[in-house]
Amino acid sequence: MRSLLSSLTVRVWGLVIFSLLITSCVKETQFDNNPEGNLDALWTIIDEHYCFLDYKKETIGVDWNIMRARYRQRLSKSMTNAQLFEVLAAMLSELRDGHVNLYAAHDVGRNWSWYEDYPRNFSQELQDAYLGTDYKIASSLKYRILPDNIGYVVCSSFQTALGDGNISEVLSYLSTCNGLILDMRENSGGSLTYAELLAQRFTNERRLVGYIAHKTGRGHADFSEPEPEYIEPSLGIRWQKRAVVLTNRHCYSATNTFIRDVKGCPLVTVMGDQTGGGSGMPFNSELPNGWSVRFSACPMYDAQMNQIEFGIQPDIQMALSEADRARGIDTLIEAARTLLNQ
């Protein structure tokens, strides 16, 4: 029963305890530094600590129990490191999780189907045209006032430090506008802290926004009771007019959480495409050969306890039309302007 920021400390300690569990697991089970040993180590790490195995089996039919035998057939004692990497990365790719990666000196194993398999619904050239050349910059926020007195803010990342002062300056500058467009397209995440600081500017009351759970054992269903997550209204300037938040499939991780937190705010409309998802808080471990593996460790849900791992639907579905693109028009921005000017 606390806000997201105050729960971060608990999360950190939870992850510290979680890391100790992983460490003790590795000490108990030693794997050889050969192709079979590295595959078995990777399979075991995911089997005991990845948080979406049952959900992925239910939704996309991934049965992790059969993956070890399936991919062991592709191993040989004479295979190169590059060949071993391809096999291990392919096994991880079955999970279809952008937070699951295999890191080696020569490559990063990944599955980016959460946005690569869908229309982009975004044009950097068009966004640059709407921003013009005289826009202002406050940390990761680019902003200006459009000719119809609509504020336009681009937030392309939560990886750059974003402070309360930055956000207050932006909202103060745009305070005379009739409405606000917050363009989150292509924002693939970063810090949950920065995402929450921005979300707090769109609520005037404490709101339940979701839940988080933690692994408590090695079983696929071994989780703690879900803990509620809240956002508190900011003590700084809060936006008191209508706002449209633009999304596409590249909205991932912390941005997915941001959309969860602001969707349902009385004055906020989410417009665009379903987000890419990525609701598991990531954690890292290591294989016998030194390669690092990242995976989702703690599942997060929305306020109705729905999974958001595969993304969040917008309030208004909207796609960038090729006809508009050819004419130098961003369909989503224009639809947002029309809505805000009604």
Can you name each region flagged by the protein language model?
Residues 26-47, 82, 150, 188-342:
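C-terminal "post-core" interaction segments
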Residues 19, 174-176, 237:
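Alpha-helix termination/capping residues and helix-transition junctions
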Residues 6, 69, 124, 128, ...:
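Polar/charged alpha-helical tracts
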Residues 7, 177, 265:
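Acidic-histidine catalytic/liganding microenvironments
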Residues 1-32:
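Bacterial Sec-dependent N-terminal signal peptides
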Residues 2-3, 15, 136, 146, ...:
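A generic structural signal for short, non-catalytic loop/turn and secondary-structure boundary residues
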Residues 25-214, 220-228, 242, 284, ...:
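Flexible, low-complexity junctional segments that flank or bridge functional domains
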Residues 14, 73, 325:
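Generic anion/oxyanion-binding catalytic loop in active/binding sites
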